[in-house]
């Protein structure tokens, strides 16, 4: 087998990196960032080769044949449960700078707003891009990103829309809860829940309510379009200051909460505001997260909804290699 040597690492013909000092130890290089407090782990190399011509096909291939890589990258003991992974791949579409597959501790994401901001900031850190407009390929479509001189990134997300309005759900212990179903790159159930309180001290109570609500959605067959699972719950309350328009708490698919205001969740919120006539096209909506970070959102009208733009900033916070020791019983995560 052909091997290319780089320092203490050998790159096998299959593209997988292994330590020259310990050939049984595989290495996967990564860069960590956070966007508004929510981590993104960009995987630079080391995953098995994916051969499908489409990005959706590559997601299916990764899920069916190599899912243990996802579990290891985003789960204990190599990561915390809130880590979102972003597998960096060559672009599929002409003009794109990269393709990205997003995933977390339980599965795969069609799109991730904070993650896309993290990917663009990471590409700048690596010297692959400079300020300006760039596009990345995601499983749900092309996402256009503007990297600004101050380090912030504005992403023009995939089209968003409200699917159903004022949907009643019976939630055990909480009675009837009314909310909207909207698509912002992922499926959301959005609820005005200010009565639960929106300080950091209320996080445990918000978590209990959001989990109970999501369980009720599943039991009662409340879904997105074409029966799609609603795997995100987004609760809204009053912001901490009049500088912002709203504060949110977002329950993610892995039953952890988003530290950022959630890019796809803010996109879904903008779709609902637009449908209700509460936010004009081009106007700025400042969405605060439960930990106090802020995204700026706006939209332009589209044929079947809106095209949202979300602006935030990511910060680099780690760089290295994940090590996979064949003698480690948890090398692929605690499963």
Where do the PLM segments sit?
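Short, Lys/Arg-enriched N-terminal segments with co-localized hydrophobic residues
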Residues: 12-24
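A glycine-rich beta-to-alpha transition motif near the start of alpha/beta enzyme domains, typified by
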Residues: 24-182, 189-335
């Amino acid at each position: 087998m052909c091997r290319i040597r780089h320092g203490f690492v050998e790159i096998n013909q299959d593209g997988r990196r292994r330590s020259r000092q310990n050939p049984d130890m595989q290495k996967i290089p990564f860069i960590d960032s956070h966007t508004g407090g929510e981590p993104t782990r960009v995987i630079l190399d080391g995953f098995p080769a994916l051969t499908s011509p489409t990005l959706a096909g590559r997601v299916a291939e990764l899920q069916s044949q190599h899912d243990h890589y996802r579990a290891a990258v985003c789960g204990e003991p190599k990561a915390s449960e809130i880590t979102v992974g972003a597998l960096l791949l060559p672009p599929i579409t002409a003009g794109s700078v990269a393709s990205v597959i997003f995933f977390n501790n339980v599965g795969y994401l069609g799109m991730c707003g904070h993650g896309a901001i993290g990917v663009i900031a990471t590409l700048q850190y690596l010297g692959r891009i400079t300020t300006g407009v760039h596009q990345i390929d995601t499983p749900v479509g092309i996402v256009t990103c503007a990297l600004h001189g101050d380090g912030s990134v504005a992403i023009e997300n995939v089209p968003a829309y409200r699917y159903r309005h004022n949907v009643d759900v019976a939630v055990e212990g909480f009675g009837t809860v009314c909310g909207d179903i909207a698509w912002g790159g992922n499926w959301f159930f959005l609820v005005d829940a200010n009565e639960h309180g929106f300080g950091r001290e209320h996080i445990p109570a918000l978590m209990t309510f959001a989990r109970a609500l999501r369980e009720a959605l599943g039991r009662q067959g409340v879904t997105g379009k074409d029966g799609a699972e609603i795997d995100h719950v987004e609760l809204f309350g009053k912001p901490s200051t009049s500088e912002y328009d709203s504060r949110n708490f977002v329950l993610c698919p892995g039953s952890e909460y988003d530290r950022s205001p959630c890019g796809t969740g803010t996109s879904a919120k903008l779709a609902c505001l637009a449908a209700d006539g509460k936010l004009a096209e081009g106007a700025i909506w400042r969405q605060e997260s439960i930990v106090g970070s802020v995204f700026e959102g706006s939209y332009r009208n589209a044929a079947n909804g809106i095209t949202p733009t979300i602006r935030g900033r990511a910060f680099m916070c780690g760089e290295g290699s994940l090590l996979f020791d064949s003698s480690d019983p948890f090398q692929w995560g605690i499963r």
